[in-house]
């Protein structure tokens, strides 16, 4: 076999400007590293501020114990991380939405960080007051309550992650709960594609149409038509009325005829007073023995 063109490695792609030994696995690891950095940068400032707050609180308790001061216990809400880890996810993959949540709640997270730092400095000052016996028990109780309130506020923000990550098991189930997992191709094959294709014997004006029914605004099923949520059976109803085999745009319509503006008879229909045959077309397509309105 003759040698390939100069500068092209036989059997391996050339990665411009990089070591040719750099593999797809290496690229994947680099991407993973970037993802980890994003998570760390998003959460580490809050984690660090909470760690400093914990250290200042523990130091305060030690000093208070040495000086025979009693401090009410903190009320610390539990963040149920276990249920978040084990719950049925809303989306797949499960956890990327956490980064979006943190981004959406950036202001609250920054407030938690700033408040934690202020409380840390406050606890250090209170520790000094205890050492010099310049503080009373009521003030210590207020300090404990203030810190408990902060932890409740912080825990509320973090616990709300569960509603973002996890499905609500108390909500009623819906047959399309996991439709977000459908690919466009599978949706077309199932007849549920929201834009771009009618399937089977249905019609699609705004893109969909399923089975033999027709539905523009959320209603019609079976062989009926429904533009505004009503008509069923073999009738057609634009404004909430006509049933049976008739057709009614403005409230009347009888027999097997169609009437848009007061005319059409027989098995045909009239938009402006004409049109016959057994089919019809609103946009130039139609099926069967239709007539095309735009050609009249």
Curated annotation (Swiss-Prot):
Keywords annotated in UniProt: Cleavage on pair of basic residues
Function noted in UniProt: Causes stimulation of sperm respiration and motility through intracellular alkalinization, transient elevations of cAMP, cGMP and calcium levels in sperm cells, and transient activation and subsequent inactivation of the membrane form of guanylate cyclase.
Transmembrane segments: none
Name of the protein this chain belongs to: Sperm-activating peptides
Propeptide section residues: 1-134, 146-190, 290-296
Origin superkingdom: Eukaryota
Keyword Transferase: no
């Amino acid at each position: 076999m003759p040698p390939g063109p100069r500068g092209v490695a036989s059997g391996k792609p050339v990665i411009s400007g990089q070591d040719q030994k750099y593999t797809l696995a290496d690229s994947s690891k680099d991407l993973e590293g970037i993802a980890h950095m994003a998570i760390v940068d998003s959460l580490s400032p809050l984690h660090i501020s909470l760690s400093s707050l914990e250290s200042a609180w523990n130091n305060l308790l030690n000093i208070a114990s040495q000086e025979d001061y009693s401090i009410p216990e903190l009320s610390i809400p539990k963040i149920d991380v276990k249920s978040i880890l084990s719950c049925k996810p809303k989306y797949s993959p499960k956890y990327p939405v956490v980064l979006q949540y943190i981004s959406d709640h950036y202001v609250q997270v920054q407030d938690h960080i700033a408040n934690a730092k202020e409380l840390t400095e406050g606890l250090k000052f209170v520790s000094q007051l205890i050492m010099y016996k310049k503080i009373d028990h009521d003030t210590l109780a207020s300090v404990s309550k203030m810190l408990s309130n902060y932890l409740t506020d912080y825990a509320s923000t973090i616990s709300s992650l569960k509603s973002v990550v996890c499905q609500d098991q108390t909500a009623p189930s819906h047959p399309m709960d996991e439709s977000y997992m459908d690919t466009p191709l599978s949706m077309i094959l199932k007849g549920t594609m929201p834009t771009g294709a009618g399937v089977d014997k249905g019609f699609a004006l705004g893109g969909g149409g399923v089975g033999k029914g027709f539905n523009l605004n959320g209603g019609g099923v079976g062989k009926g038509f429904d533009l505004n949520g009503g008509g069923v059976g073999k009738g057609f109803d634009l404004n909430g009325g006509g049933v049976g085999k008739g057709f009614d745009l403005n409230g009347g319509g009888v027999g097997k005829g169609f009437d848009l503006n007061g005319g059409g008879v027989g098995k045909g229909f009239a938009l402006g007073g004409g049109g016959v045959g057994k089919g019809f077309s609103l946009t130039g397509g139609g099926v069967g023995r239709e007539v095309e309105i735009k050609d009249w």
